[in-house]
């Protein structure tokens, strides 16, 4: 069951949502967490991890000034039944900051697959999710008609 915490909206109208005492940045992210729990219970995946963190650029010092590392915290890491691991980020839209972090991630971690997914009741799978780029393609085609 989804418990909405104090209605805190960010600039993209996402509402923080709490499930199992875990606060998610958006309702869609919380719903995907529930989907992953269901997939694990059904034996469709082996396991999953919340918010895996990746260092995109190490911290450094220059001219006596310290610069912090640039980090990327994904939404989930999924482990399949054949021990293949991939990263999932639930996105409604891609911000400029995320596009840069995605580019840095793909450069630094070329062997780790990053899947972007969106929620779409109309076009999504049984859990209501679809590949972000596939949804963009469908929407573009539908605008053309």
Predicted regions and their residues:
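Electrostatic, structured charged patches in enzyme active sites and in nucleic-acid/phosphate-binding
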Residues: 1-145
């Amino acid at each position: 069951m989804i418990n909405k915490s104090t209605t805190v909206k960010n600039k993209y109208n996402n509402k923080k949502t709490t499930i199992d005492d875990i606060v998610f940045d958006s309702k869609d992210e919380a719903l995907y967490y529930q989907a992953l729990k269901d997939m694990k219970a059904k034996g469709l995946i082996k396991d999953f991890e919340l918010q895996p963190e990746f260092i995109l650029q190490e911290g450094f010092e220059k001219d006596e000034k310290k610069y912090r590392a640039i980090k990327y915290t994904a939404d989930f890491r999924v482990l399949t039944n054949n021990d293949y691991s991939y990263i999932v980020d639930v996105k409604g839209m891609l911000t400029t900051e995320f596009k840069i972090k995605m580019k840095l991630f793909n450069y630094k971690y070329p062997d780790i697959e990053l899947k972007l997914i969106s929620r779409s009741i109309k076009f999504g799978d049984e859990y209501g999710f679809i590949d972000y780029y596939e949804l963009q393609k469908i929407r573009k085609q539908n605008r053309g008609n």
